[in-house]
Amino acid sequence: LGDRRVLIERVILARTTEERDDALAALLPLQRKDFTELLDAMDGLPVTIRLLDPPLHEFLPDRTELAVKVAVAEARGETGEQVDADRRLLTAVEKLHESNPMLGLRGVRLGLLTPGLFALQVRAIGEAASDQILAGKDPKVEIMVPLVGSVMELHLVRDETERILGQVAAKKGVTLTVPVGTMIELPRAALTAHRIADAADFFSFGTNDLTQTTWGFSRDDVESTVFASYLDKGVFTISPFETIDADGVGRLVQIAAEEGRKTKAGLKLGVCGEHGGDPESIHFFHKTDLDYVSASPFRLPVARLEAGRAAVG
């Protein structure tokens, strides 16, 4: 994220509204430039922009390094503005420390609890798309809200998104049509898809996190400690992070797809995650009547080939 990470850190740690607004104001042109370059490169092609999703700790200074820095300064009897600032920063970081960051303040939760953060991203997207239109280009942008577990979360973000895009369109003198959808990466989201579909123009199944939250696995931990033994014992025949677990995670995908389309016929459904480049998983998603898969660039040739094979049976 470069300079953007530092500015997001300032937004999150701001002690006053003025501090937060200053950081947001500095971040806006950077994000607008990011999105302008993206839409320019993808002119006429669909682009889905996911709002900020990383866990909170990825935007904060390293807690251990900061604690050591403060402890060393205190042991040396150092004083001054920098030492005081480091102490305040450590206090703030300690307050925000999470035991399980992947299930903590991230995604839509971070956006709802950090005033102005998602609003800034939406404004930057709207301004970038408007400038492309005024330049005679054809931006096709969608906004995706991560880690939604309740339809009310999506309603809150969608209402703010539509308000901001309306302001931008009026100011720029253009018409903006920006679908707003959500990731389905929590079991509760899958099981309440009939409600969430009310506020969504599309679903994208985040199967990496959906696998973690369904199995109760922390992927970074269990792959090095559990998986080899589970494969030997026959609990797995293959890692559920490589090929979709059709009976568990896959069943949630099926439920969400069926229930979502009962509420909103024609609801666009897709997959983002490593499973989108796995041949067996792609065939499963085709049978589940999903519209598309997305994959890492190096997996795209396989994904295209297998999607074609699935389509022709």
Task: Give the residues covered by each predicted segment.
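Conserved alpha/beta-domain cores
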Residues: 1-313
